[in-house]
Amino acid sequence: MTIPLYLEDSYLKTCSGSVVEIGEDKSIILDKSIFYPTSGGQPGDKGFLQFGSGRCEIVTTRKGENGKIILVPLTNDYLPKLGDTVEQFIDWETRYNHMRVHSALHLLSVVIPLPVTGGSISDIKGRLDFNMPESLSDKEELESHLNELIAGGYKITNSWITDEELAAQPGLVKTMSVKPPIESGRVRL
């Protein structure tokens, strides 16, 4: 299992780690990672690993079995070796934009209080699909309300609740097709 450092500190831009596995496809698995894997419609982080006198570009990150976070290199030309200590660097501009779009979509789900059936995020835009029986009549009012929330400058925080607390408050989950991971005993809000 890879320790997902991004869950505790989304603003961590660099960190060291040790290579614990190199996949047959030359993917890299570290003991701990600041790279967020593709999940829930949000793209995985990209960046690079620095080791010795080398540098390995990471083009995306994905989830693997048993909690592994898989880093996908651009090429197989220059990779760290098993056991190497590497310095991780995420593409901070892209990560930060993903975070901003993600937060904006949470606000949109408040402005449109309907179940979410799908969505996607990029570093420049996002989309939510709603289970909407009919078209919304006043899009300008919705846009104005959303812009008010964004301009409000509210502090964004995260917290953790237990799986049992989430089960007791089903209204916290807006998505119909993607449920939060509940097998770990706690869920990040």
Task: Report residues per predicted region.
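Active-/binding-site microenvironments in catalytic and ligand-binding cores
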Residues: 1-189
